[in-house]
Each structure stands twice: as C-alpha cells, then as structure tokens.
C-alpha cells in the first residue's frame, strides 16, 4: 500500500530586508504572536498588519498591535459573518477603528461563494449593507479600506464606485480576472498579492502584478491560509512572505530588495504611516 508523501515543513525564503506583510491573521496561526513576530523579523519582515474578521478577532488584532511596535491592526466584521454586526458590535468597532494602532477597516467586502454552502453565511443584501457601513467608518476615520472579495467582482465594483472613497482601497488576496485588475488599477485601488500568485496555474495574477503601477502593489501572507509554493497546503505564517515577494519581484522585473522597498513605501502610505 502506498503512503502519501508527507508535506515538506515550510521554511522562509532567503532573508530579504525591509519586507512587509500587508494582511495576516496572527490570532489564527498555530504559534503565539510573539514567536510569529520574531520569526518574521528574522526573515526580514519589518512591519505587518494583522486582521480581525470578527469582533473577538479584531480585539486580538488590536492587542497585538499594542504589544509589538512592528504590528498594526485592521478591524471589521467579515462579509460572511455580518449577522454579528449588531449595534453593540458597531459601537465597539467604531472605538477600535479610532485607535491609532488600527490602520485599516477590514476585512470587509462581499463573498458569494459561501452563500448556500454555509448556514451562517449572510445573504448578499446584508453583506452589501455591512460593506457600506464599513466604508463610511473608513472615510470618517481616514483609514484604509481592506476588501475581501470572493466571486463577487461585479457587485463589489458597483458598490465601491458609488460609495465615498476612503484614503485607500486595498483588494486583499487579489484573485480576480485581468479585466477586474485593470478596472481596479484605473480606479487607483491597491492590489495585494498573497501566496496564490505563486501557484503555477495563476499566470494571470502574475500578469496583474506586472501591470500594476508603482504604489498600487502590496504583498501579504493571509496566514495561516494561502501558503505559497513550494509549501502549498501547509500552514502559512508571516515569515514565509519572502516566497511571494520573490514571485512578485520577478513578475515586476525588480530585484527582491527593490520590491521590498516599493511595497514598504506603499504600506506606509496606505496605512497612514508615511
């Protein structure tokens, strides 16, 4: 009887000084935040944004941002969970978003993939109402808007087009077709590329990374998800961002160090740290 080949243990790429991780979930990773931040630093990661996609997760993100100077927070209710966005949750989110260590409202957005597949997934009309609420909070607080989009390109572009514009709109874990990338870039949105840009079949994502003007590209792990090649399927963490950086740098015709400098400047600008 044949046995499945064990997955290799993920290890960081070569150390690339000045890296960033624009979107990660420290509270969902296996190890303690302090350990994750230390390993990320050893891999060259100078700063990262940890994301809360529910109220408890947002509290944890903000706590991590206060505990570590290189960590910032994003706070929101995930589109599939907007049934949790009651008045009490709204009031607490407004407080968290106002905190200087919170640099973005997110992740918010639209997700049609889970509608009908998950009993707890909110319907699209509720998701849209919650997205508009989050956009208003981002505008009021002058914070970036961090967007989750799964199988909702047309509806998302429609909502973003007729809503007030925040200081920056980041399409996290960008995974949409090239025509959506072009439309988003024309509007000035920032495309944040995760580990799936390294997947062999995703040449169109690499083309989107190539097309994006300077200042409209970020890189992220979305850890513990979206582990890049050659460790796809294993558990992700911020220290593995170098694999995505190498891929995006090659797509953009840059050295890894040049890409690190570019995305670090974009991180500072969109998250209000410049």
For each feature predicted by the language model, list its residue ranges.
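Mid-domain alpha/beta scaffold segments of enzyme catalytic cores
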Residues: 1-274
């Amino acid at each position: 009887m044949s046995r499945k080949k064990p997955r290799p243990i993920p290890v960081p790429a070569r150390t690339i000084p000045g890296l960033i991780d624009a979107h990660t979930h420290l509270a969902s990773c296996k190890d303690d935040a302090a350990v994750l931040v230390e390993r990320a630093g050893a891999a060259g990661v100078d700063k990262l944004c940890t994301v809360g996609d529910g109220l408890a997760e947002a509290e944890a993100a903000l706590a991590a941002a206060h505990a570590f100077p290189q960590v910032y927070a994003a706070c929101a209710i995930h589109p599939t969970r907007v049934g949790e966005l009651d008045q009490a949750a709204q009031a607490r989110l407004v407080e968290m978003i106002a905190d200087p260590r919170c640099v973005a409202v997110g992740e918010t957005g639209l997700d049609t993939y889970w509608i009908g597949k998950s009993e707890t997934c909110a319907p699209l009309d509720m998701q849209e109402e919650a997205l508009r609420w989050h956009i208003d909070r981002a505008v009021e607080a002058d914070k970036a808007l961090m967007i989750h989009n799964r199988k909702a390109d047309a509806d998302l572009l429609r909502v973003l087009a007729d809503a007030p514009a925040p200081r920056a709109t980041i399409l996290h874990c960008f995974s949409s077709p090239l025509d959506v990338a072009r439309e988003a870039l024309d509007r000035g949105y920032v495309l944040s590329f995760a580990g799936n840009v390294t997947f062999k079949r995703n040449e169109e994502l690499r083309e989107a990374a190539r097309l994006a003007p300077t200042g409209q590209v970020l890189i992220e792990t979305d850890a513990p998800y979206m582990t890049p090649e050659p460790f796809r399927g294993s558990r992700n963490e911020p220290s593995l961002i170098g694999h995505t950086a190498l891929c995006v740098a090659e797509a953009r015709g840059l050295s890894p160090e040049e890409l690190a400098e570019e995305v670090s400047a974009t991180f500072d600008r969109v998250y209000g740290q410049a």
